[in-house]
Regions:
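Long, low-complexity, charged/polar intrinsically disordered regions in eukaryotic proteins
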Residues: 1-29
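Flanking helices and flexible, charged tails adjoining ferredoxin-like Fe-S electron-transfer domains
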Residues: 311-364
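Short, amphipathic alpha-helical interaction segments positioned at domain boundaries
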Residues: 91-128
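Short amphipathic alpha-helical interface segments
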Residues: 35-60
Length: 364
């Protein structure tokens, strides 16, 4: 019976846009067992991606649990980073969340070696295929400020300063990078930076992190300073793929599950949303190789002592631009602009549509 409740939870999670596919090894069940008690798994099966009130959730649960008992259980699940939560006035709202971005990121300061071992196995196999099947539209690359030239008409969702300006300052939470925490526990510390507080959350998610003590508050000026330092350290800025993102992470290919997976495939440019690509001025390039060292996607190589960009691999982050001593590289805007969805709900709807189109193609 205990095994069955986790199997039911796996099926429940798998029906959402960011699914939770089954495996032959059962590792996906072990991941859930690390996180949920059987009682919590039973409750989670009754939750939706859309926020619901405590009272509505109680109506959906068949087992005999009082409203007060359910509230305690849900609040415990929130504190464990298993579900989403927000408060509006006196009302409390709860929702299910996917494994990524969601449950995994909410495990900051709660990781164990046993969980990491099973999570890594799942992440590198069936779950990786799940993310790849959606082209990973949960993420977009924000180009470095100094890499954008005046002739580039930069949309607000591509301009770091505008993104931060639009955020409510009391919702900004700075937390430790879950990917680097995981690598530290595995004895594989980050090769790019010794910093660990490198993930920012905003809006409802930021308030959740702050309320739960998973993050500390910082202001907008501190936020911009942190992100600019991350750029200097050679980190790629990735945000949620919405017009007003609820997170920005400072990423590297040695720790970040998304960037490392992108680097492993032939065409990272198709895997990460970005509106830019790097272009080299052959007349100015001296072949010093600085850009090759900065690029995390192996998108640059020297041909006849001149840097050449592989457009299939370039994700438009601008790391190569900001440190070119000859100013021979600049970012060029793509002809077709990728406009992010307005909200997370719109994002999930877009991902669901892409997955359905793929299913229909596979049937033919």
């Amino acid at each position: 019976m205990t095994e069955e409740v986790y199997q039911n939870l796996q099926k429940h999670l798998d029906q959402f846009p960011i699914g939770y596919p089954a495996t032959k090894t059962g590792v996906e069940i072990r991941v859930l067992q690390h996180l949920f008690t059987p009682e919590e798994a039973e409750i989670a099966i009754n939750l939706k991606l859309a926020y619901e009130t405590l009272e509505n959730i109680h109506k959906n649960i068949e087992n005999h649990i009082s409203l007060a008992e359910l509230e305690i259980a849900l609040d415990t699940m929130v504190s464990k980073g298993l579900i989403n939560f927000k408060r509006e006035g006196e009302n409390k709202y709860y929702a299910i969340i996917p494994l990524v971005v969601g449950i995994y990121e909410y495990q900051v300061d709660k990781l164990t070696k046993e969980f990491i071992e099973d999570f890594e196995q799942y992440k590198d196999n069936e779950f990786a295929l799940e993310l790849l099947s959606t082209k990973n539209l949960q993420f977009r690359v924000i180009p470095l400020e100094q890499s954008l030239t005046p002739e580039n008409l930069v949309a607000s969702y591509d301009e770091l300063r505008k993104i931060i300006e639009n955020i409510e300052e009391d919702s900004i939470g700075l937390t430790k990078c879950i990917c680097r925490q995981s690598k530290d526990l595995q004895g594989q510390p980050c090769s790019k930076t010794s910093e660990r507080e490198l993930c920012l959350y905003f809006g409802n998610t930021g308030r959740l992190f702050l309320d739960q003590g998973w993050a500390r508050p910082i202001n907008k000026d501190e936020t911009l300073e942190l992100l600019r330092k991350a750029e200097k350290d050679g980190l790629v800025l990735q945000s949620g793929n919405t017009k007003d993102p609820e997170f920005i992470c400072c990423c590297c290919e040695c720790c970040c599950g998304i960037l490392s997976k992108a680097k492993d495939i032939p065409r990272p440019a198709q895997f990460l949303a970005s509106n830019y690509y790097a272009e080299v001025d052959k007349e100015l390039c001296t072949g010093c190789g600085t850009c090759l060292e900065r690029c995390q996607m192996n998108a640059l190589k020297l041909v006849n002592n001149i840097s050449k960009v592989n457009l299939k691999r370039c994700i438009g982050c601008g790391l190569c631009v900001s440190t070119c001593p000859e100013e021979a590289i600049h970012l060029r805007k793509k002809e077709t602009e990728v406009v992010p969805p307005s909200t997370v709900d719109d994002l999930y709807a877009e991902i669901a549509q892409i997955k359905e189109e793929l299913r229909q193609k596979m049937k033919k």
